């Protein structure tokens, strides 16, 4: 199901006021709200709220009523967020991506690998994750840091997409990794990429909606859980995800817009996890938490 963005284009000051209005209107609900700078010199900003298509009619009605009362000149616009369109670009348009010690590249760029690179070969295809998106690159940076500095005996990549993050963990350390996704096409693509990278024996791929699979109890609890999904489902699954984390374990979360980070951190703090750090990439954040 598509994700929808409703937004108003305005000045920075007005965008902040509209953000406050939306926060008051939807404060107890799981809709992502944020502001984005479009043009610094011209003072053009956007105030946005994100929702799934099934919620659009109700959210749009409430936003329009609120804007009409407080910002009668504001014009509400709509955008359908592409789910995988960017992934299917021609291979020629995808340059190698460096994140930490990792080099994520397509088969056409094997000559770009340098000595010391941890190379992951992922061609553009049907599943999310070639390293070019800020969320994937951010996760790779934090994975590199966590796996080098903490004891990690097993890992879970929840919402694996192309499998790039599971492959990264396995290439860093010879530990078992469970890679799951709700989409069977993604699971198939991930399994193919695991084989392409020569580590098929170390990664188990499974199609599983949320945590509704015996695979989690069979392979967990986990020292490292990575979930590069979206803020709303991440918030919802916080209590359940925390039950699958081993004592002293780490969680890496992404798919989160900068303005959503505090809600996500609050949800996981409520699940007794501690915020370690947040890194920023192109308007997206990756959050590292652990269990003390």
From Swiss-Prot:
Which Pfam families does its entry note?
A: PrmA
Query: Biological process GO terms, please?
Result: methylation
UniProt KW keywords: Cytoplasm, Methyltransferase, S-adenosyl-L-methionine, Transferase
CDD domains given in the database record: AdoMet_MTases
Note the SUPFAM superfamilies from the entry. Answer: S-adenosyl-L-methionine-dependent methyltransferases
Q: What is its EC number?
A: 2.1.1.-
Is Cytoplasm included in the keywords of this UniProt record?
Answer: yes
Q: What general EC class does the enzyme of this chain belong to?
A: transferase
Q: What is this protein called?
A: Ribosomal protein L11 methyltransferase
Q: What organism, scientifically named, is this protein from?
A: Rhizobium johnstonii (strain DSM 114642 / LMG 32736 / 3841)
């Amino acid at each position: 199901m598509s994700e929808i963005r409703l937004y108003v284009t305005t000045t920075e000051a007005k965008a902040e006021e509209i953000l406050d209005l939306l926060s008051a209107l939807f404060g107890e609900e799981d809709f992502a709200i944020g502001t984005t700078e479009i043009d610094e010199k011209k003072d053009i900003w956007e105030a946005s709220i994100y929702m799934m298509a099934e919620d659009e009619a109700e959210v749009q009605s409430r936003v329009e009523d609120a804007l009409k009362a407080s910002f009668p000149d504001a014009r509400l616009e709509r955008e359908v967020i592409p789910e995988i369109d960017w992934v299917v670009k021609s291979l020629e348009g995808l340059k190698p991506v460096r994140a930490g010690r990792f080099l994520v590249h397509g088969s056409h760029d094997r000559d770009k690998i340098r000595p010391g690179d941890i190379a992951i070969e992922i061609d553009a295809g049907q599943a999310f994750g070639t390293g070019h998106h800020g969320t994937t690159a951010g996760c790779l940076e934090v994975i590199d840091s966590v796996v080098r500095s903490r004891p990690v005996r097993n890992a879970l990549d929840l919402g694996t997409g192309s499998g790039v993050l599971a492959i990264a963990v396995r290439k860093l350390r010879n530990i078992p990794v469970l890679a799951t996704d709700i989409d069977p096409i993604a699971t198939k693509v991930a399994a193919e990429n695991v084989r392409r990278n020569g580590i098929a024996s170390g990664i188990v791929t499974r199609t599983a909606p949320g945590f509704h699979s015996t695979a989690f109890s069979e392979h967990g609890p986990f020292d490292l859980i990575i979930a590069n999904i979206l803020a709303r489902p991440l918030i919802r699954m916080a209590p359940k995800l925390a039950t699958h984390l081993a004592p002293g374990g780490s969680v890496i979360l992404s798919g989160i817009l900068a303005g959503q980070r505090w809600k996500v951190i609050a949800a996981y703090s409520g699940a007794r996890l501690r915020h370690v750090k947040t890194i920023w990439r192109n308007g997206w954040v990756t959050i590292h938490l652990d269990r003390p």
